[in-house]
Amino acid sequence: MAIHLYKTSTPSTRNGAVDSKVKSNPRNNLIYGQHHCGKGRNARGIITAGHRGGGHKRLYRKIDFRRNEKDIYGRIVTIEYDPNRNAYICLIHYRDGEKRYILHPRGAIIGDTIVSGTEVPIKMGNALPLTDMPLGTAIHNIEITLGKGGQLARAAGAVAKLIAKEGKSATLKLPSGEVRLISKNCSATVGQVGNVGVNQKSLGRAGSKRWLGKRPVVRGVVMNPVDHPHGGGEGRAPIGRKQPTTPWGYPALGKRSRKRNKYSDNLILRRRSK
């Protein structure tokens, strides 16, 4: 969608750049409420995920990541805003009467038809197993475990590429730059996720950030020593350590945090780029 700029009447409108208006009128049988009580806290009430809290109340839209309406054509009826993700969603009316939401593929418009199955056309928005796709196909919403539903390349503008097929596995290049193996029987959706220009948005003011449920970020070096290992000192002082650390004393900023000997290590052919 296009980026909309406001007339510069106030500082917030001068610096803001938002998506052109996309309406949201979700179906009642495809939404349910969410109960956010933690705000980044664990069961003991201790902050484990910082800078979270507040935000506007949201209704969760049930998204069909499995695409298990096989060989039944559906038509895109609406393109809607979803407050729970930066990608847009589409309402699909299938010929058997089923109605579901899916991620909006880039370039899809109202009235387009989609289908999922084993022998379907290689067309934007169609879902099929990797074994039926030609090499070089751009895909998103990729399954890792057969039948579990898409888990990879679901953010706005995300796209992966099928680069090889050998034996029981297919080789994919993911949006992060990682190259990994996935079962050829897993399904994916053809095309790229829509709302590619999401990184061009500028909220323009702090209040818009708070609506998203994000609180201010404070640097550890300006805290007191009791609050952060980087804190303390007279005036503007260095951190006083060999390397930066988290508030709990673990290495930060560059230290690899992936678990050693993880089960999926043998499936990753090339580590993601930084």
UniProtKB/Swiss-Prot annotation:
GO cellular component, one term: large ribosomal subunit
Disordered, as annotated region: 1-23, 224-274
Family: Belongs to the universal ribosomal protein uL2 family.
Keyword set includes Chloroplast: yes
Assembly with partners or alone: Part of the 50S ribosomal subunit.
Pfam families for the chain: Ribosomal_L2, Ribosomal_L2_C
Chief place where the protein resides: plastid
UniProt keyword Plastid present: yes
Locations listed in the record: Plastid, Chloroplast
UniProt entry keywords in alphabetical sequence: Chloroplast, Plastid, Ribonucleoprotein, Ribosomal protein
GO molecular function: rRNA binding; structural constituent of ribosome; transferase activity
Gene Ontology BP terms: translation
Protein name: Large ribosomal subunit protein uL2cz/uL2cy
